[in-house]
Every structure is written in C-alpha cells, then in structure tokens.
C-alpha cells in the first residue's frame, strides 16, 4: 500500500464522477458526532492535545490503526505535519514500507505508538497494544476543558474558575450507525448530491501518517516530516 495507490483511486473516481466513501466508521456514530460538534462549537476551547488508547489483539497498524489515526485527526480538526513512532516488540526491523498480509494475521502487522504534530500547534497521541485486554478510550483536551468518549459513553469536563464541572452526554437516538450509517449516507448522496464524510483525500491523509510511522520506526523513531516520499 502506497500513496501512489491512494492517488490512483482518487483520480479514477474523480475522472468517472464516482463517489468514494471510506469506512472510517466512527464518523457515523451519533454520540461521537455530538462530541465533535461540541468541540467545533468551542465547548472546551481550542483543542491542544488528543489522546487515543486502543488495546486489542487486533491492534494492527493497517487494520484498526487506520480508524484510530482517522479519529484523532477528525477530532483535532487539523492536518498532520510530522510523525514519531515506536512499534511493538518483535518489529524492530519492520518498515519503512507496508509489508503485512492485508490485515489478516496480527503477527504480520505491528501495533504502534505514535506522536503526531498538527498544523494548529496541537499534538495527537495514539497508543495501541495487542497484549492488553480490550480498551478503547479517546480524550480531547482543550484550553477550557476536555471531552472523553468511548464506544457508547461520553463526558464533557469544563472549567469554572478553579472548579471542574463534569457532565455525561445523553446518547442520541438513531436508526443506523457504523457501516449501515455509511451506506445510508451514500444513498442520500446519490439522490441529493454532496460530499462523503470521509472522502478519498481524507483517507489518503490517514495513510500518509501510517506510512510515516513506518519510516519513523525504521529510522530509529526519528521525526518524519510530512509530506513524505514513499516511492
């Protein structure tokens, strides 16, 4: 998998006037959308740090890792500019290019810890591990508070002088989510027009971060500036 592969997909769909929607599924989770809207509306001030933890036997960089990186970039609302990364033990010689079996066997694709610099000055941290019981937790820290969200629960903490006020968000009512939400959006776009929640260029940005993390791991965890050259 290379950026050139992604570019060919984007060009082909644009040339043929075809919708390309990428299944980064949390874009169709109503509770996660509500949290993102609150951040956009300034509920916690300016986002300065995003922390995502995902532990699972399937914490593979090019499987669930794609969703994790998409999530932090989405919530940060900013483009990545540099990446530092450290792979799990046993992958010291992995990289600088994708070399797994396409997301099937976990021993071919590393879990990764990475720090992503963003062009608004914020930082995003993604930490994944295959040997810890399943945990999925996202925290967004802003200048006036924080949002914490997992699969089906979310809290917002804001400052009031020296006091911290925490409240749990109600779960929105919905008729479709996950992949079904993605498909419902596609049908609506075909009928009425518009742009997908996750188009090819958005997904390409995620791929670039993943590939940069492999280059960082291969270069002794060095800082890799974007855009990268993965030819």
Identify the role of each PLM range.
Residues 104-109, 119-184, 199, 228:
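NAD(P)-dinucleotide binding in Rossmann-like oxidoreductases
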Residues 11-16, 37-41, 66-69, 99-101:
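Short, hinge-like loop/turn segments at secondary-structure boundaries
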Residues 14, 40-43, 77, 191, ...:
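Residue-level signal for alpha-helix termini/capping positions
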Residues 48-123, 127-133, 201:
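Rossmann-like dinucleotide-binding domain that binds NAD(P)(H)
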Residues 1-27:
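Beta-strand-loop-alpha-helix segment that lines the small-molecule cofactor/substrate pocket
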Residues 165-231:
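C-terminal helical cap and adjacent loop that interface with cofactors, partners, or active-site loops
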Residues 9, 35, 212-213:
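Aromatic/hydrophobic pocket-lining residues that form π-stacking "cages" and hydrophobic walls in ligand
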Residues 16, 30-49:
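Rossmann-like NAD(P)H-binding beta-loop-alpha module
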